[in-house]
Amino acid sequence: LSQNAFLAQIYHKPGVLTRRKPSQKELEDIEFGLPIARKLADMEIGQTLVVKNKTVIAVEAFEGTDKAIQRGCEFAKGGCVVIKVSRTNQDYRYDSPGIGPQTIKTLIEGGASVLALEAERVMVVEQEKVIKMSDEASLTVICI
């Protein structure tokens, strides 16, 4: 059985989860990066993309989400948008893409401004902590 069936409360519908809303420029970066992230995920390259000023800064590969975020934030010098998606044919019985407090810590340390998650397809574990940490750092978390 799919994990989604039992964990529906940690897969969010579209909307902003934090107090800070994305700027118009950040929304444009999300719009630019989302189709790229989906394509890369479907090619089984990675599920995380770092974008700034409509430029791809980093792509997740074998190293995993946190390392891709660290690398992207380092090159972007902060203020970047991080997009996390799932594959179109994601098998949720075995693998559920997700983020949690460690991801948020990595984003904050790197100076990212937005985390955009694919709505109802990327899980948020320890949600209250994720939102509290993000709000305290003025990091936007949005489900798209």
Where do the model's predicted regions map?
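Conserved mixed alpha/beta catalytic, RNA-binding, or beta-rich assembly cores of soluble enzyme
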Residues: 1-104, 108
